[in-house]
Amino acid sequence: MSLWFLVFLSVLQGVTELFPVSSLGHTLLVPALFGMHIDKHAPQLLPFLVALHLGTALALLWYFRARWIALISGFFAQLGGRKNDDGHLMWALIIGTIPTGIVGLLLEKRLERVFHDLRIVAVALIINGVLLWVGDRIQRSRAHQAPEKMTFKQAFFVGLAQIGALIPGFSRSGLTMIAGNVAGLTAEKAAEFSFLLGTPIIFAAGVLELPKLFHARDQLMDALLGGVLTAIAAYLSVRFLMRYFEGRGRLASFGVYCVIAGVFFLGWFMLHPQPV
């Protein structure tokens, strides 16, 4: 892997994993646009992808470190019989993680193979954009509540939304923000809940494949560099997004981008078919 391509993929992963625009979709579509094919199941690529996921997860953990300390403290306090908002939210995050954890382990590889037709990925990106616009409209028309007041049923519903992101073209953060809007969260709080909810999933995606990173010693330096670059890109992305939504930023803006990008990619790959 050339240095510039390593840098390109690392930054692309760090940004699109958190922006509601589908990291997997962009990882497939953008390189193919420039004539580069990425086999996500190639043995030599696995250590690199492990490092990218770990870099993203570490960036999220660092950005929300104070929040996680409060959540974990509240969780153990609640186990000790002292009810509190942080403990309740921690339970909500645990419940929200369950659907994707189970379905991801069972179906992720199968879903990725089925949807590697880039034209289908482009269509999924367009649908993702429409859903972001709908979610924005819902958020602006509903009464709002704090994440700590979410019911466990609502948390499970938000967790279910993550399953859609197993299909390339749909965004994990985007779908969970939309579900958070439906549950009555503001744009800012829906984004925060989405990032907190996604951290264990992203971290687990890296940890489960961690042995492959250490078995590929000849690729360790590339993987480490990719992980560091992804962590930096992810940290800057989450900081930007939280400020964006705090300043009344809207999901609809990302929806417009996804529709335009999806239409462009669909047209391009209709004219320039790629091997599936």
Curated annotation (Swiss-Prot):
The keyword DNA-binding does not apply. Bacitracin is thought to be involved in the inhibition of peptidoglycan synthesis by sequestering undecaprenyl diphosphate, thereby reducing the pool of lipid carrier available. It comes from Burkholderia ambifaria (strain ATCC BAA-244 / DSM 16087 / CCUG 44356 / LMG 19182 / AMMD) (Burkholderia cepacia (strain AMMD)). GO terms for biological process: cell wall organization; peptidoglycan biosynthetic process; regulation of cell shape; response to antibiotic. This is Undecaprenyl-diphosphatase 2. It holds the Pfam family BacA. One of its GO terms (cellular component) is plasma membrane. Belongs to the UppP family. GO terms for molecular function: undecaprenyl-diphosphatase activity. It is found in: Cell inner membrane. Its EC number is 3.6.1.27. Keywords: Antibiotic resistance, Cell inner membrane, Cell membrane, Cell shape, Cell wall biogenesis/degradation, Hydrolase, Membrane, Peptidoglycan synthesis, Transmembrane, Transmembrane helix. It is a multi-pass membrane protein. Catalyzes the dephosphorylation of undecaprenyl diphosphate (UPP). Confers resistance to bacitracin. It catalyses: di-trans,octa-cis-undecaprenyl diphosphate + H2O = di-trans,octa-cis-undecaprenyl phosphate + phosphate + H(+). InterPro entries: UppP. The keyword Signal does not apply. The chain crosses the membrane at residues 1-21, 44-64, 87-107, 114-134, 150-170, 190-210, 220-240, 251-271.
